[in-house]
């Protein structure tokens, strides 16, 4: 992350939310004298990309390798610089340009051509690197106006902290692995063993949904976390 103007060490994890007009250099880093980009400034924190399809496709594509390697290397004629970029990518988007896709009560819909242009900005390989996809449906007025109490943040924090502690203990012998998302193939085989029924369920999902080998590993990592 970036320290405050008055200096001092950081005491909380960074949260970066760049505008969709950002350039690829500003996102991953670079320049004549390379400077870290947003993906390095969000190292060990969260990189939030709001309205994902509004980013230029070329800008989004440069995320693919850093997401895989958790670092980014910038090469220039006389030197090469490597910056860390182990961040949690969180992105949001509307389901269509109008925002009302598949809503029978919506006054506006998008044509198939508009949908194709909109969704084509996000490539399959990039989506394949996002572990969890959640579709959020419209909330009716009755539920919005209800007086409901959600789960307190401190309770959620305790649960997350407990899960992270379990993972830290699990990977105590590894210097470069601290949580499930960082597992390599060997660790996945060791810590994500499936029984026969689970294996058959995963096999069926892989075949019916035409999932990739990368998706297979990520499903196991998320399952281990849950």
Task: Report each predicted region and the residues it spans.
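Walker A/P-loop
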Residues: 1-7
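Mechanochemical coupling/switch segment within NTP-driven translocation systems
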Residues: 2, 12-18
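Switch I (G2) and immediately adjacent beta-strands of P-loop GTPase domains
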Residues: 16-26, 92
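Solvent-exposed alpha-helices and their adjacent loops that cap or buttress functional pockets
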Residues: 19-20, 39-41, 81-83, 126
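Basic, amphipathic alpha-helical bundle interface domains used for macromolecular binding and assembly
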Residues: 33-34, 57-226
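Walker B catalytic acidic pair
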Residues: 44, 50-52, 62-63
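Residues immediately C-terminal
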Residues: 47-48, 54-55, 141
């Amino acid at each position: 992350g970036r320290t405050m103007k008055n200096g001092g060490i950081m005491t909380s994890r960074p949260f970066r939310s760049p505008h969709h007009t950002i350039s690829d250099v500003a996102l991953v880093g670079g320049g004549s004298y390379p400077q870290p980009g947003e993906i390095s400034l969000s190292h060990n924190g969260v990189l939030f990309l709001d309205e994902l399809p509004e980013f230029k496709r070329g800008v989004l594509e440069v995320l693919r390798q850093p997401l895989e390697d958790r670092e980014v290397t910038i090469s220039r004629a006389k030197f090469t610089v490597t910056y860390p970029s182990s961040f949690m990518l969180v992105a949001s988007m509307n389901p269509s340009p109008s925002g009302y896709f598949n809503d029978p009560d919506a006054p506006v819909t998008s044509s198939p051509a508009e949908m194709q242009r909109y969704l084509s900005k996000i490539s399959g390989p990039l989506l394949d690197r996002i572990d969890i996809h959640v579709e959020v449906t419209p909330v009716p007025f009755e539920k919005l106006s209800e007086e409901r109490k959600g789960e307190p943040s401190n309770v959620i924090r305790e649960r997350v902290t407990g899960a992270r502690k379990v993972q830290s203990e699990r990977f105590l012998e590894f210097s470069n692995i601290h949580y499930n998302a960082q597992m390599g193939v060997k660790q996945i085989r060791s810590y994500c063993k499936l029984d026969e029924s689970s294996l058959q369920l995963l096999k069926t999902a892989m075949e019916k949904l035409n999932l990739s080998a990368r998706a297979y590993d990520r499903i196991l990592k998320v399952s281990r976390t849950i």
